[in-house]
Swiss-Prot record:
Further remark: This protein may be expected to contain an N-terminal transit peptide but none has been predicted.
Presence of the UniProt keyword DNA-binding in the record: no
GO BP terms: L-arginine biosynthetic process; ornithine biosynthetic process
PANTHER family: ARGININE BIOSYNTHESIS BIFUNCTIONAL PROTEIN ARGJ, ARGININE BIOSYNTHESIS BIFUNCTIONAL PROTEIN ARGJ, MITOCHONDRIAL
Name of the protein in question: Arginine biosynthesis bifunctional protein ArgJ, mitochondrial
Site (Involved in the stabilization of negative charge on the oxyanion by the formation of the oxyanion hole): residue numbering on this chain: 145-146
Function: Catalyzes two activities which are involved in the cyclic version of arginine biosynthesis: the synthesis of acetylglutamate from glutamate and acetyl-CoA, and of ornithine by transacetylation between acetylornithine and glutamate.
NCBIfam families hit by this protein: ArgJ, PRK05388.1
Enzyme superclass (EC): transferase
GO molecular function, one term: glutamate N-acetyltransferase activity
InterPro entries from the UniProt entry: Arg_biosynth_ArgJ, ArgJ-like_dom_sf, ArgJ_beta_C
Length: 457
């Protein structure tokens, strides 16, 4: 406990750190140079040597709270759930979301499909952190990411956890190093933080920080990757779980890079209440709950979009907006299908305004409610990010005379929005329903094949 007491002093400050020059110049703009982090949380990123390469980058992340936290998480739906997923799920169930103190994460080895030994390794990681915290019962969530089917170098990890604990810090450098420690094929660490207030105590400032990793094997079905969120707001566990589930459905579950859902996907949130105030409950009538729902959703959307911007070999960040649908779920399914279509993704990489591929994806989407997609009412457009007029490709089922030169200019940009209107284009026939779903995805390039062809070499 003494180490927490020493390090937490002066925590409510803004910090700055130099940019890692190994990060591609085009990605440095996404890395924060400072941050405002939640009270009572300490973090560290440590080089252990889990990864096969000889890099000296950190590959063991530790996030700890000075006091017990409410905790919640969402996990992968992949049938081959990794050992840390099983262990963390069991801990949260046993503790009912109460009394969680830490999260420990290794990168470089997924500890998935590793049998009884893999489960024992995951338990040992959490137990070692608990020992460092002076605790006798399981209070640490465990995550792993990397190559599937290989055992962890568990001795290396266990031998270095005490050092990782000793190095816990509240500085921006520490948060950035911790975000870097969970990376695999990522080209930059993904870290965000913000402050917020709640209606019940507008004079009180709360803080929210989050880190995530992912660049490939990304497609939601709960989850999509690894992510850890921390806040010093007081939130009851049941409220935290419902808040996270809502936010993830509209953020981490609304991105796609390659259509693959990992065995290890986990997004967790810890709330230690260190900033004080009345606990947020899951009451639908609670203004604090509603406000925090909007705050958390917006925050996780920004965080998850960083994953898309770091998609393996990606050159474009694409928003697909499906609007004027009778049902939200149908709109979501259509957006998801477009986002994972290899033909759509390669056309965008080639700067080809081939709207037929988009239309094809709309047409073969499975599970859409009858009457949702009516060809005579379907429109497709490109929306430039510079605010200039949309480029209509298809209006009410009829193809437009496309200005190929303007289309090429739009597709040269890094950001692009595809708008699919199921209610009659500009008319916006609200009688059909005004439901809208949004997905974020990237294109497919030659480099994606190279990266994944060489993944284990």
């Amino acid at each position: 406990m003494a180490v927490f007491a020493r390090m937490v002093k002066g925590q409510v400050r803004h910090y700055s750190a130099p940019v890692d020059m190994a990060i591609p110049a085009s990605k440095r703009k996404f890395i924060p140079s400072s941050g405002s982090y939640p009270k009572g949380f300490l973090v560290s990123g440590t080089h252990v040597g889990v990864k096969a390469s000889n890099t000296k980058f950190p590959d063991l992340a530790l996030i700890s709270s000075e006091t017990p936290c409410s905790a919640a998480a969402v996990f992968t739906t992949n049938k081959f759930q990794a050992a840390p997923v099983q262990v963390s799920r069991d801990i949260l169930k046993t503790r009912q979301g109460h009394g969680i103190r830490s999260v420990v994460i290794n990168s470089g080895c997924a500890n998935a499909v590793t049998g009884k030994g893999g489960l024992e390794d995951a338990v040992a990681m959490g137990k070692k952190v608990d020992e460092c915290n002076g605790l006798n019962e399981p209070s640490t969530l465990v995550m792993s990411t990397g190559v599937i089917g290989q055992r962890l170098p568990i001795s290396k990890i266990l031998n270095n956890i005490p050092a990782a604990h000793t190095n816990l810090s509240s500085t921006h450098d520490a948060w950035l190093s911790t975000a870097r420690a969970i990376c695999t094929t990522d080209t930059f660490p993904k870290l965000l933080s913000r402050t917020f207030t709640l209606p019940s105590s507008p004079e009180r400032t709360y803080r929210l920080a989050g880190m995530t990793k992912g660049a490939g094997m990304i497609h939601p079905n709960m989850a999509t990757l690894l992510g850890v969120l921390c806040t010093d707001a007081p939130v009851e566990p049941s409220a935290l779980q419902s808040l996270l589930k809502y936010a993830v459905a509209r953020s981490f579950n609304s991105i796609s890079i390659d259509g693959d859902t990992s065995t290890n996907d986990t997004v967790a949130i810890l709330a230690n209440g260190a900033a004080g105030g009345a606990p947020v409950t899951s009451s639908a009538a609670s203004p604090d709950y509603t406000a925090l729902q909007d705050i958390l959703t917006s925050f996780t959307q920004s965080l998850s979009q960083l994953v898309v911007r770091d998609g393996e070999g990606a050159t474009k960040f694409v928003t697909v907006r499906v609007q004027n649908s009778p049902h939200y779920e149908s709109a979501r399914l259509i957006a998801s299908t477009i986002a994972r279509s290899p033909l759509v993704k390669t056309a965008l990489y080639g700067r080809d305004a081939n709207w037929g591929r988009i239309l094809c994806a709309i047409g073969y989407t499975q599970g859409v409610a009858p009457g949702t997609v009516v060809p005579e009412r379907t429109s497709v457009s490109f929306k430039p990010v510079d605010g200039s007029p949309i480029l209509k490709l298809l209006v009410n089922g009829e193809p437009e005379q496309v200005d190929e030169e303007r289309a090429s200019v739009i597709l040269q940009e890094e950001d692009l929005e595809i708008v699919v209107d199921l209610g009659g284009g500009e008319k916006g026939e609200q009688g059909l329903g005004g439901e809208e779903a949004v997905y974020w995805f990237c294109d497919f390039s030659h480099e994606y094949v190279t990266i994944n062809g060489d993944y284990r070499t």
